[in-house]
Structure formats: structure tokens, C-alpha cells
Amino acid sequence: MARQVKRRPHASARPESSSDSKKPKLKHGRHQMRTVTRTARRPGQQDFEEESQDTYDNQQLGEDGQNDEESEDEQEIEQESGKAYEALLTLLKSDHKESKPARKSDKVEENQDEEEEDDEEIAGANVQNEEDQDNEDDNEDDEDSARGLAQDPLEAHFNRVEDSYIDNQERLVIKEREKWTTVEKKTYDNLGYSSLTQSPPGRAISIPSKTKVKISDFFIKKRVLDAFEATYPSDFEKLSPLDLALLEPMMKYQDINFPYKTFSNTSYRKLYALHALNHIYKTRDRIIKNTTKLNNYREALKNGTANLDSQEPEFRDQGFTRPKVLILLPTRNSCYELVELLIKLSGCEQQENKKKFMNQFYAKELPPDTKPLDFRDSFKGNNNDFFCLGLKLTRKSLKLYSSFYSSDIIIASPIGLSMILENPDKKKRQYDFVSSIEVLIVDRANQIEMQNWENVATVMRYVNKIPKDFHDADFSRIRMWSINDQSKLLRQNLIFSEYLTPNINNLITSKSFNIGNKTKFKPIINSNNCIMNSIGLKLKQIFQRFDSPSPVSDPEVRFKFFINTVLPSLMKSSSYSDGIMIFVPSYFDYLRIKHHLKSSTKFNFGSIDEYSSQSKSTKARQQFMAGKINIMLYTERLHYFRRFEISGVKTMLMYGLPSNPVFYKELVRFIGKSVFREQCDLDLAFVKILFSKWDAVTLERVVGNERAHALCNSPNELFEFR
């Protein structure tokens, strides 16, 4: 009888034992990993294979059920695998306690679940890391084979690329930083978009292409197609032109930067949800199929029916860890909406831990009706921005709160994930579970940017980083480009935002290395549909340009121009000595201006920002409205989070254009409110905006592309609109 080898916990939490101490320490350095040429086992290792079946295959496959009685060793392993979640649990309990009013109908349920909630506060702490044997017999594999795996974009992008090709692309794209070339430009006049596709230096991955009209024309798993048809029957028959233009590069695993223009446009979400599920199911089924082939070969070898001259088949179809899709979202409510969509499109009959998920992520609360519609959409429901959730897909169920290392999809806020990746307690830091991400999705990027973009930068540093521990990974199944730290060259990045900003553009232009091409969408904004035309107020709007040599020096040049040219003449140019608001987009510029006004001028001013207390904000606004404060400093992030309607504004000075064009409209209407109350004259009030040529993208959203080009390139520096 073959002896059994006990499975080990994750290396990061492996208990010390005498047997471990005797084993030589493996070298996992970058040099050692790059010199690997073959890791598949030889036929001579048959006996060892029978004795110790690698657990990583089982983790990748998943199972539908689990025995109720588990050994103590199994339970210990499950608890160790939840360490990343426990780090987030500790932080949430200390800093982010939530209070929910008790409902009579829930009292009994709450008492029953009280103990469970204490143990599993957030994101799968102490959730068992079950090993699912999901032996799905799927007829879709036969269909895929008939259509030809060579035509499948997933196979072409991840599994059929040559190692020598990736090595060469790494040299050109990352090491030598050669320029990408534009290979295609499209204009969708009836959709209000244009697109630009760029190809990496050398050559892009070749993806077979044919004309597609409906969603069934794409290589999508039948179970996902059936669920999509049941949920969106009209879209199943024929996709809208915009959805088709977006889905085609998405299914080819190209990077995409897509501004959806308005919060009410949510159609793109069903597309990336479908794409993520399709990627998970196809990857899992490929692993199952290859594992079956390996097992058949080993069984034949054991029975003596195999060809002894043939080598064991080699299948490189995995990464270091199981999670393949990472989705970054700003709030728990946005996570709730996405999970509901994933459940609909997954085709799963059961959902595990759904009640717990509803309790922690769903809320009925809505912002006041007096707030703008986009504000109500952003902050509806549970707007807590601290979460990290694992989702595991099996043949019949979708499990919420699965441990990170047994999850297929990770949905997280940037701050929630970054607190795990860079936990202050070094012993609790975990980042191995994002080492094998193949599809990265950032949705509602503008909301995330308003929270703290540094957390996104933190996440990007750890995605596809070589893991510090290998968690019983079977190196004979890991793709060579993963072992050689080249995953970033194959990872697809999908970025969705309401409007484009330098930070968001940078994710695709500078932080993306996907050699499968990148497609950037851009809204067509002209003088007819720009935000300026929707103000409904014939107010003088003065745009003043200053010369700035580079984006890096722009903040310094802007500040000097402001204090030397604009500020000294501010009181003279304004028809009113009070009611002057200075709007500052950047918090750092705001602090600098505030310090200058306080130390170098005698202006009677007040200031409110996103960190001001409620009492201070209320007092400053009242004093400004009463004329006790002549000048008010006001930040963009404060406006985003509170949407104040400031009274008493007679003159508006914008230190820079707001990134959100809707804010420009709302700020200008502050003056309209004063005009309506007869606090100032429409002909005497005005708005003045400072800008440089580096503000062209933001300027275009306000005045339109034709005017923006003229404002940035005209010999004149002063422009007036009404």
C-alpha cells in the first residue's frame, strides 16, 4: 500500500517540526526561478506521484461538497489559509464598526447568527479552505474542440504564446521602454465616441478575428450564454453598437480604458461581469481536462499499458495561486450590485453565505432628495469603503466569503486590499493571493480617485508579484511566464470611469504592459454637448491661460502666477469686496494657498475642506453668507463628499478646472443662486478660471474640443464666454 503524505499548511504559517527542520531550504530567488527550463515530473517518479498527489490541483478544481467530519489537521490548514482575512477583520473591528438599527423581524435571526458574526466579521475569516473536487462533465468542451481551440482568444493569449516571444517582448516593452504604435483609429459618430488601438513594440499577440454581431458569436461558455440570455434577452439577440464596440477588444484580452460619461450608463458592467465569469469557467475547465489526461497517463503507466518510450504529458495551465480576477470598487454598495449581477450571470443554482453578505453589504439608506442624482447614486446604500471579498465558483454554487487562496474572484476596495498587502504587522502581511491575477478590473475609478489614489498605486505594486511562499504549487503545471515574473505582460487591465483624468490614463499608458494591445475610448465632446452649454445662465466666464513648460513644473508655475498676477488684482477686478470664492481642485494646492493668504496677506478669509468638522464648515459658510468673511477657500473633494450649496457667492475664482465637469456647472450656479436672491447683479458677477495647455483634457469637457484647442494654442491668453 502506498504510504500517505500529510498535506502541509501554507508556507507562511507552517508550524515548525523536526521533519521540516531536516529538509534543505529551497531557493526561490529570482535567479533560480529564471533558470528553470523544465519542471514536469519524469515517468520514473510514478511511485512518488501515487504517494503524494499535489494539493494545488485540487484547490484549482474546487468541489461541490465537503464531508462534515474533517480531521484536526484539515481544520488547522483551513484556519491558516484565512490569515489574510483576519488581518482585515482586526482593522474593521477597531476602526470601522458599523451600527445597524435592530429590526423586530430580524431579532431571532440575529440571535442565531450572533456567534457566527463574531467569528466571521468580514471577508471569510475562519472560513474553511475546502478542497473542491469539481469534476464537471461539460459538453461545452466538445463544442470548443469542434470550433477549434486555436480560434479561442483565451487560448491564444495565455496558453499558446512562445516563451522566446515573451522574452523578446519583455526586453522591448519593459526593459528598453520602446514606443507603442497606433494601429487603428475609429470614430463612432452616432455613439459619441472615438477609439484608438495601440500595439506594443515588436508585435502583438495574434488573435483570430471575425465579424461579430451578437453575443453568441464570441467564444463564451454555454452556461454563461444561457444565463445572459435569461437575464438580458434583448441584448442576447443583438448587442447595441456601443456594447459591441466595447466587448470585441475585451474578449480579445486587450487593455481597455473606457469613460462611460454618466453614472446612468451601466451597460458596460454586464459585459465585464460576463467576461470575468467566462474567463474563470474556461480556465477551470481547461485545468480539469488536463488533470484528467495526466491521471489517465499515470494510471496507464501503473497498469503497464502506457508506451514506456513516451514522456509524461506536460500541461502549463496555471499560476502560483488560484485567484484569477481582481475587481476594485469604491464602496460596499457597488460590490453588492456587482455580486448580484455575477450571481445572475454565473448560472449557479446555489449561493453560500448570501445572508451574511446581505447583512454586511446591503443597506436601504438613500441620500436626501435635495442632493444631485450622481451624488445619490455614488453614496446610496452601504457606502463603507473598507472591504475585501473572495468569491469561489463551483459547478452548482457560488460561494461568498471564500478564503483568498481558494477564491476565483477577489472583489475589494483599494484601501481594504492595501491594508492586507501592507499590514502594519509584518507577520500578517499577505500578497501571494494576487500573484496570479490575469484580469484586473477597476470600476468607478473616479470615485476611487476621490477617496485616495495612493491605495490603487499600492495594489498595482503587488499584483503579479512573485509570491514569497508557494502554497504547495505544482511547478510542473505553472506557466513559464509566471515563473519568470512576466505575468504583467499577459494581464488584461479594464479601467472604467465617468471621465478621464491623468491618474486614470496613467494606469493604461504607463502601468500597463499587456502585449495583447490596448484600446482607449474617448468621448466626443464639442461645443454643442459640452457642460458649458447646460448651465442655463448667461454669466461672464473668463479663461486665463498661463505658460507652463511641463506637467511636472505646472503646480509650481501655477502657484507663482496666482500669487504674483491673479491675487493682487483680485479685489480690484471684482465688483464686490465680499462673496469671493476660490475653488481649489488639489488639497495640496489648497494648503499652500491657505498658508500664503494667512502669512503674506491681510485678506479676511475662511477655508473649508474635506477634513473640516461639521461645526467649522457650518460656521464658515454662515459667516461667508453674512459678509463677515470676504474670501472662502473651497476644495473639490469637499464638494464631492458633501455637495454643499454655498450661499453668498458673487465672484468665483477657479484655481484650476474641476476634474468632474458636473462640478463646474454646480459651482457656476452658486452665483446664479445669489443673482436669484438679488444679492448681486448678473452683469457684474463673473467666473475666472486659470488653466495651462496641460489642462486640455479637462478643458475639453467644459468648453468642447474645438474651443479647447483654440484656448490652448491661440496667441491670446484671455478668453471670455457667456
Curated annotation (Swiss-Prot):
Region of interest called Disordered, as start-end residue ranges on this chain: 1-162
Domain of life: Eukaryota
Keyword Ribonucleoprotein part of the UniProt annotation: yes
Basic residues biased stretches: 1-11, 24-33
Biased composition (Basic and acidic residues): 93-110
Compositional bias (Acidic residues): 65-79, 111-122, 129-144
GO cellular component, one term: nucleolus
Subcellular location: Nucleus, Nucleolus
Assembly information from the UniProt record: Component of the ribosomal small subunit (SSU) processome composed of at least 40 protein subunits and snoRNA U3.
Family, similarity comment: Belongs to the UTP25 family.
PANTHER family listed in its UniProt record: ORF PROTEIN-RELATED, U3 SMALL NUCLEOLAR RNA-ASSOCIATED PROTEIN 25 HOMOLOG
Role of this protein: DEAD-box RNA helicase-like protein required for pre-18S rRNA processing, specifically at sites A0, A1, and A2.
Identification of the protein by name: U3 small nucleolar RNA-associated protein 25
Organism lineage string: Eukaryota, Fungi, Dikarya, Ascomycota, Saccharomycotina
